[in-house]
Amino acid sequence: MVLEEGVIPGVTTLAELAPIIVLGIVLGLYELILIHRDESFRGSHWFGHGFHAIVFMFVALFFIFNTEYFLSITGLAEKEWPVISSTWGVRIIIGLILNIKMHAVSAVIKGGLRGSMTGGMAEHWTHTTVVSALVVLAPLYWPLLVGILPEWAGGVPAEG
């Protein structure tokens, strides 16, 4: 199925959205599991944070997979500014924003930013850094995953 060029700039087929959808669900659930392991969520808290984690992961991955396109349409690639004109510089900035967002959200689960047992959960920086690194490095490992994923998840069609 082909999308019109004006619907989502830079995306011409639904297959180009596969890495965002598949990795968004997997990494969003991974983020949720890390928090769920440390804190017993119930009912709407679990659903609310899960929905928030997955949606935010979709947004971050959309920007990560379309960084070159963004830099080209904004003209930032030609500016040659040290970090902002670099594809990896922008991806790392997105990863830092994602890392801080995850840590802040986990810190306020119980209503505090102190990061202690009484003030909030404050998910470990290690956990949030692992998730952020998986998001930032997604364009590198996605081609490896395509070979083992089913076709409906963006994998290579089976021959035969």
Task: Give each language-model segment a name.
Residues 1-14, 156-160:
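Short, strongly hydrophobic alpha-helical membrane anchors
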Residues 31-43, 100-111:
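C-terminal ends of transmembrane helices
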Residues 138-160:
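Juxtamembrane boundary at the C-terminal end of a transmembrane helix
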Residues 101-126, 142-144:
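Membrane-helix boundary connector in multi-pass membrane proteins
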Residues 13-40:
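N-terminal signal-anchor/start-transfer transmembrane helix
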Residues 48-71:
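A generic, lipid-embedded transmembrane alpha helix
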Residues 10-18, 41-55, 80-87:
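Transmembrane alpha-helix entry/boundary detector in multi-pass membrane proteins
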Residues 65-108:
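Alpha-helical transmembrane-segment detector that highlights a single hydrophobic TM helix
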